[in-house]
């Protein structure tokens, strides 16, 4: 059967109804009916062709091939005039390109042999060499390897990272994925989940960004999860410039992973809470840097300064350094606080609590020593150049200051309130995140704190 000079159908037997304009073509056993339309070939055992609407279809299984793909299905339709095809039941699209590996499995697909675009509207799986896509509705261009995906589709990269959202755009060639609405990006290597209202992932650079109620959930400890919020959260690899010149795609082995969050950073974990305006985490050094009025809480202790550096061991802090002014306050009872301040502060941690503290430069201390009956009845004010303190069960076990300098010890019943606090004392408890959800609470007081000038080791900030 021929139609024009571009459509040919080969069969062993044909029946035709003039009233319905339907031709039915059959093949002998061991053979197939073949439709050829330029670079499109369709094969099946029984082929139906409606000349009235220029539409052919099969119901007993068939195969359609063009220059890009092969499509198998139980039921199929093909229109030579529009080049549109419809496939249903056990649909399998396989790329014929030697440079590509692509398989699409679904129960229904619309496909155009000119554009090589597949439209999916039911549960579908798209498998490529560098990842897998799970979707219930989407458009996939098999020629450009670009996809628009809807209804919370899921992209799983070859390294195990995943990206999902209400709407996704994904480019397989570049490894770039963009998500809109309730997005979730999982970094399985670094055990971090990023959530937000908008975000993207770039596989080649192993980089990602989320914004719009952005949240990072870090679960590497296996026992407790860190919840971190900022306006924008970014993760990426750094590459040494000299090594990146030869090949901008390959990633040298000594790269390091970074996470940067800013502004309005707040985080919560059951044993540690904090805030600042900018935070970065350097994976290779296991270092966390907090800038612009950072404050950290651990139980009834509060530490603040201009910069806080925290060293992480398996996501647990083992030491912290405040190189440009540090202040630690420990709430005792009612309006009483143990306080230590200095130009530089270094603390070590053990079992989730502070174990040792060193303070140097302009050291100032206010202490309320506990009596044998567990009461407090006097307050000590001391200044020196250096301080060293050991802690046990979250309480000061030993304290040493040098060189020795005179201090004052005042009974509480004689003490005036102006000696209760060091000049730089501030208690930021109202700003402390108290739950995972509370990290989103950016209060006016926190915004005002971020606008203040840096702390001074001698000047009052009360």
Q: Where would I find each of the regions flagged by the language model?
A:
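Structural signature for solvent-exposed beta-strand/loop edge elements and short helix-capping sites
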Residues: 1-462
């Amino acid at each position: 059967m021929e139609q024009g000079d571009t459509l040919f159908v080969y069969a062993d037997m044909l029946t035709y109804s003039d009233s319905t304009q339907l031709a039915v073509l059959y093949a002998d056993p061991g053979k197939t009916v073949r439709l050829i339309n330029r670079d499109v070939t369709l094969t099946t055992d029984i082929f139906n062709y409606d000349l009235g609407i220029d539409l052919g279809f099969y119901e007993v299984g068939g195969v359609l091939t063009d220059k890009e793909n092969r499509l198998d299905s139980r039921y199929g339709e093909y229109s030579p005039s529009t080049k549109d095809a419809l496939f249903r039941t056990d649909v399998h699209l396989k790329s014929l390109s030697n440079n590509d590996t692509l398989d699409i499995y679904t129960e229904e697909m619309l496909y155009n042999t000119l554009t090589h675009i597949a439209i999916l509207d039911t549960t579908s799986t798209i498998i490529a060499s560098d990842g897998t896509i799970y979707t219930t509705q989407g458009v996939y261009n098999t020629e450009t390897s670009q996809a628009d995906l809807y209804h919370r589709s899921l992209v799983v990269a070859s390294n195990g990272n995943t990206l999902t959202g209400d709407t996704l755009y994904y480019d397989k060639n570049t490894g770039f994925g963009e998500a809109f609405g309730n997005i979730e990006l999982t970094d399985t290597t670094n055990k971090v989940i990023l959530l937000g209202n908008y975000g993207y992932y770039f596989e080649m650079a192993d980089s990602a960004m989320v914004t719009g109620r952005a949240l990072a959930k870090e679960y590497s400890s296996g026992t407790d999860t860190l919840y971190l919020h900022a306006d924008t959260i970014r993760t990426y690899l750094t590459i040494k410039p000299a090594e990146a010149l030869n090949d901008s795609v390959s990633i040298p082995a000594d790269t390091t992973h970074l996470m940067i969050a800013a502004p309005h950073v707040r985080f919560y974990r059951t044993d540690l809470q904090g805030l600042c305006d900018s935070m970065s985490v350097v994976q290779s050094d296991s270092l966390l840097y907090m800038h612009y009025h950072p404050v950290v809480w651990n139980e009834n202790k509060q530490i603040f300064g201009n910069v806080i550096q925290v060293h992480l061991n398996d996501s647990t802090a083992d030491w912290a350094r405040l190189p440009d002014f540090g202040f630690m306050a420990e709430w005792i009872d009612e309006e009483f606080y143990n306080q230590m301040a200095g130009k530089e502060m270094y603390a070590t941690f053990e079992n989730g609590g502070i174990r040792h503290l060193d303070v140097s430069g302009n050291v100032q201390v206010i202490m309320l020593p506990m009596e044998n009956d567990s009461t407090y009845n006097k307050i000590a004010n001391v200044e020196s150049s250096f301080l060293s303190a050991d802690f046990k069960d979250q309480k000061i076990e030993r304290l040493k200051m040098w060189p020795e300098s005179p201090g004052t010890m005042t009974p509480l019943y004689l003490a005036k309130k102006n000696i209760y606090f060091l000049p730089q004392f501030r208690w930021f408890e109202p700003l402390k995140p108290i739950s995972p959800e509370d990290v989103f609470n950016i209060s006016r007081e926190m915004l005002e704190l971020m606008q203040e000038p840096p702390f001074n080791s001698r000047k009052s900030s009360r």
